[in-house]
Amino acid sequence: MSDNCLFCKIIKGDIPSDKVFEDAHCYAFRDISPQTPKHVLIVPKRHVEGLNDLQGLSDAELAACLRAAAAIAAQEGVGESGYRLLSNCGPHACQSVQHLHFHLMGGRQMTDKMG
C-alpha cells in the first residue's frame, strides 16, 4: 500500500466508502460521481499504478479483480442486461487516481461511442 494513495486509504478504512465487495485480493466500492446508474470501482488491494505496472500483481490478484467484476455485475442486477468494464491508463485516458482500478458501469442502455 502507498501512504499517499487515495484508494489505498479507502482500502485501509482511513477514508469511508460504500463497499460492495471485498476478498483477499480486491476491494470494490461505489463511485462517488457515478456516470451510470450502476458505477462501481474495482481495485486490487496491492498498490500498482495502472495497467502498465501489471508486473506488480500476481496473476491470481488480477484474475480475482476480473472474477469480482462478474460477481458484482450479478449482485448489482446488470449481469444479464450488460455492463461495461474499463480501466483508464495514463493522462490521455484521464486516469485520475494512480492506482489500478476498473470501472464497472451499467444500469442503462449505453452507446457504442468509446472516445
Where do the language-model regions lie?
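HIT superfamily nucleotide-processing domains
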Residues: 1-115
